[in-house]
Amino acid sequence: MSGLFITFEGGEGAGKSTQIALLASHLRNHGFDPVITREPGGSPGAEAIRHVILSGNAETYGPAMEALLFAAARADHVDQLIRPALAEGRIVLCDRFIDSSRAYQGVTGNLDATYMAAIERIAIDGAMPDLTLVLDICAERGLSRAGKRRGSDTADRFEKEDIAVHEARRQAFLEIARQEPARCKVIDADRSQEKIADEIRSVVDTILTEKGLL
C-alpha cells in the first residue's frame, strides 16, 4: 500500500470529525485529494452494521458479539474502501479504527486481549495505520461537548454510558499511545480548534515531507 493511512481516535466529544475536516482542507490546499471515512461504517456493508451497533440492538448479546460485528464492518471497510484508496496513493483519514475496538470492547468490555488481537488481525489483514492521532480530553468535558453537538437528538449507545466508563476508555487510548509511540501521537484536545489543528498539521506535514510528498 503506497498511500498514507491516518486514523483519529479519542473519546466522545474529542473533536475528531472537526479535526478531520480541517486536516482534509489543509491537504487539499497542498494538492492532495484525501479520502474521508469513519468507523463503524465507510462502506455499504459496514454502514448497515453501524446502524445495528449504534442503535443498541447488539448490546443485548454482549461485548463479544459487538466486537465481532465491529470486526465484520472493519473487514468490509478495509476491503472495499481503505485498501483500494491506499493502492491509488491516496491519503485516507479515518474517524476511529482498531484502537476504538481495543478501548471500547477490549478494555471496558472486559474482553480477552488475545481474542481481540485475533479478530483485529483478521479484520485489517495488514492494513495498519501509518499514524494515529489520539485526541485526548477528560471524559466530563468530552461528554459535555458531545451533548451540545447532538442538541435534541438522542444519545447513541455509547454516549449513554457512565462517566467512569468513558474515563476508563480515555486511559485505554493513552496506554495504547504509550505502548505504540512510533504510530500514535497524543494531541491535547482541550484547546481551541485552531491550536489543535495547527499541531495536527505540523505532525502530518512532517511525515509528508519525510516521504518527499510535500
From Swiss-Prot:
This is Thymidylate kinase. One of its GO terms (cellular component) is cytosol. It catalyses: dTMP + ATP = dTDP + ADP. InterPro entries: P-loop_NTPase (IPR027417), Thymidylate_kin-like_dom (IPR039430), Thymidylate_kin_CS (IPR018095), Thymidylate_kinase (IPR018094). Its EC number is 2.7.4.9. It comes from Brucella suis biovar 1 (strain 1330). It is an enzyme of class 2 (transferase). One of its GO terms (biological process) is dTDP biosynthetic process. Disulfide bonds: none annotated. Belongs to the thymidylate kinase family. ATP binds at residues 10-17. GO terms for molecular function: ATP binding; dTMP kinase activity. It comes from the Bacteria. Phosphorylation of dTMP to form dTDP in both de novo and salvage pathways of dTTP synthesis. The gene is tmk. Keywords: ATP-binding, Kinase, Nucleotide biosynthesis, Nucleotide-binding, Transferase.
